[in-house]
Amino acid sequence: INLGVFENGGNYELLISSENEKLEFANITFGDIWVFAGQSNMEFYLCGEKSGNELLNTKEGKKKSTTDKIRMINMYNIGYMGAAGEVENVPLNDWNEYWTELTPDRVSYMSAIAYYFSQGIKDRYDRNVGIISVAVGDTEINQWYPRGESFGKFTGDSGKLYNNRIYPFTKQKIKGILWYQGEADNYRTNMNAEEYSDAMAGLIDLYRQKWSSEDLPFYYVQLTRYETKDASEIREGQRIALQKVRNKKNVGMFGLLDIIGRYDQGEGCARTDIHPWQKEVVADRFLDYVGHDIYKDSEANTSGPVYQSKQKIDNTIVLTFKHKGKLKVMDKSQYADSVCEQKISASSTDTSILHEF
C-alpha cells in the first residue's frame, strides 16, 4: 500500500481495519531516508575510533545518542555473513529487520559515518532521518552489481550483495545513496582506472534505474592512502566515473588525501591504518554535498580543489586548481614520509616522498 508522500514530522498513528481485524501502528515518523553502502570504512562502527568512544562517554554524546528523530535499519547480520560467506544468489524480497530509534547501545555499533551524517542533517536542516546501513567489509564492487548487468567493459557476475542488501529496499522511497568502497578492488581484483570507472558509473546508473529515479542523489568517497600501496588507479577510476554517468545531476565525489594525519601517528592514521578514524570529516563532506544539492544550502562547499592545468616556468611547475574557497598548502610533514631538501635530477626518483601523492 502506497500512502503517498508526507511532510517531515513525527509521532503519528496509523489504524488499518476491516470487518474481522484491526491493526494499529504507533510512533510513526516521516523524514529523509539515506542508504549507506560500500565496504568496511562505511561499515566502521562509532565505537571503533577514539573520538567516537570519547563522545559516547560524555553527557552530551549520550543525549545526542538518544533521539526519536533518527531511525535506523542496520543490516550487518542480515543476508550476507561477511565477505567470504555463502549466500543464496536470488533477490531477498523480505527482511525481518525493523526501524529502531537511537540509543547509546545501538549507536556504539552503527556506522560512524551514518551517525555523524544523520546528526548533521537533523541539526542543520531540522529533518528526521532514516538510516539504512548495508555496507560489508572487504567486498568488491562486483558483489554490489546485479548479476549479468553491464556498463562499458564491465559486467557483473556475482550479484550477492545487490540481491540481499540493495534489492530489498528498491521499493522504499529514499533521499539518496552514500558510497565508500574501492579498497578491495585495489588490493585484490587489481582493477585499472578504466575498468573501475565503468563499474562505478554503471553502478550509479543501475541503482537509479532500480529506484526509478534518473537523478537519485549518489555521492561517494575517493580513496585515501594506505601505507605505500598504490591506489591511484582506483582513485582515477572514481574520478573518471563522474564523466561517464549518464545523468550528472546530484552525483558527486570528494577526496580525503588532506586528512591523512602525520605519518608517525600509528593506529587510526591513513598512513598505517586502512581504516582511518576521521569519520566525522567524511560525514561532514557528505553533508556539504547534500546540503548544497538537496537542501539548497548556499554556504555548503561541495568539493576540494580540482586540478585544472599545469605550466612550466623556468625550473618551476605551476599547478592551477579550481576551488570555491581559499586554498591552503599543508606543511610538508603532513604529507611526506620525510622531508628531503635535495633537488631531484631529471634521471632520478626521490624515494623519500610518499608515492602517488
Language-model region placement:
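Cell-envelope and extracellular/periplasmic
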Residues: 1-357
